[in-house]
From Swiss-Prot:
This is Ribosomal RNA small subunit methyltransferase H. It is found in: Cytoplasm. Specifically methylates the N4 position of cytidine in position 1402 (C1402) of 16S rRNA. It catalyses: cytidine(1402) in 16S rRNA + S-adenosyl-L-methionine = N(4)-methylcytidine(1402) in 16S rRNA + S-adenosyl-L-homocysteine + H(+).
Length: 308
């Protein structure tokens, strides 16, 4: 049951400012969510500007239907399919692409979605509920090794192997089909307690990341965004945990360094390897005031780069 689906957009003004909006520009909001960033971008555009937003969550698509604006198009796709979404929208050479990655407050707060251990609900966890395997279905078939790797790699949980063994043993007695069942198994297994954090937190994060292939989606989306940008266009990415931020940091760093010099020398000046991105400023984090107003913003990090 949904208890609270209010969503407070994180780093709203900072993200839109980082895009360096041109009034007649073309922009992509690769993670529409509930449209906080999109609405703010639209407010900066004139009648010649255009915004294409992307989201794989059907509830986000439904929320986007409220925006009646000829400058705006919302595409139902995962952001890992950014190139396909751009083709569908008929855009190229855009002025900015924004990512606000990870799970949203409405997804967490809707107990029926199965993202949170705070509600006892079907163990689903799919961001796109129209396709793919649920978390319960995966746990029913996965081997101990696979469960261990997912929880260790995506949850950074040191009791991953013990949790995996517990899950496999428990499913022989009865199927694990609810968030309450999975959370109870994890709590029984994790022998240490971190202040202010439920023992199930890391395992729920890991399972969600795996079911939605969140890190892989980000890895394939960033090169597509770079290809889509025109020179001078901005790439802005907000992430919420170290696994995501590492991918963004490494991508931007690697693309800001020229490729190795070819062995076939001499070369003309136009043949010399050139970097593809310029890093813009330092990573930005929410202010103390924003974190106080919205505690879920505390782990956010925003990185900015400009295409050369």
């Amino acid at each position: 049951m949904t208890r609270s689906t209010a969503h407070v957009t994180v780093l709203l003004e900072e993200a839109v400012g980082a895009l360096a909006i041109k009034a007649d520009g073309v922009y992509v909001d690769a993670t529409f969510g509930r449209g906080g960033h999109s609405r703010r971008i639209l407010s900066e555009l004139n009648q010649n500007g255009r915004l294409v937003a992307v989201d794989r969550d059907p509830q986000a698509i439904a929320a986007g239907a409220e925006i009646d604006d000829s400058r705006f198009l919302l595409v139902h796709r995962a952001f890992g399919e950014l190139a396909e979404a751009a083709d569908e929208a008929g855009i190229r050479d855009v002025d900015g692409v924004l990512f606000d990655v990870g799970v949203s407050s409405p997804q967490i707060d809707d107990g029926e979605r199965g993202f949170s251990f705070r509600y006892d609900a079907p163990l689903d966890m799919r961001m796109d509920t129209t396709q793919g395997e649920t978390a319960a279905e995966w746990l029913a078939r996965a081997e101990i090794r696979d469960i261990t790797e997912v929880i260790r790699n995506y949850g950074e949980e040191r009791f991953a192997f013990q949790i995996a063994k517990k899950v496999v043993a428990a499913r022989l007695e009865q199927p694990i089909v609810t968030t309450g069942q999975f959370a109870a198994l994890v709590r029984e297994t994790v022998r240490t307690r971190e202040p202010g954090q439920d023992p199930a937190t890391r395992s729920f994060q890991a399972l969600r990341i795996h079911i939605n292939q969140e890190l892989r989606q980000l890895e394939v989306a960033l090169p597509q965004a770079l290809e889509l940008l025109k020179p001078g266009g901005r790439l802005v990415v907000i992430s919420f945990h170290s696994l995501e931020d590492r991918i963004v940091k490494n991508f931007m760093r690697d693309q800001s360094i020229a490729d190795a010099m070819p062995k076939s020398l001499p070369l003309r000046a136009d043949q010399l390897p050139k970097p593809k991105l310029r890093l813009v400023g330092r990573p930005i984090k929410p202010s103390a005031a924003e974190i106080d107003a919205n505690p879920r913003a505390r782990s956010a990090v925003m990185r900015i780069a400009e295409k050369l």
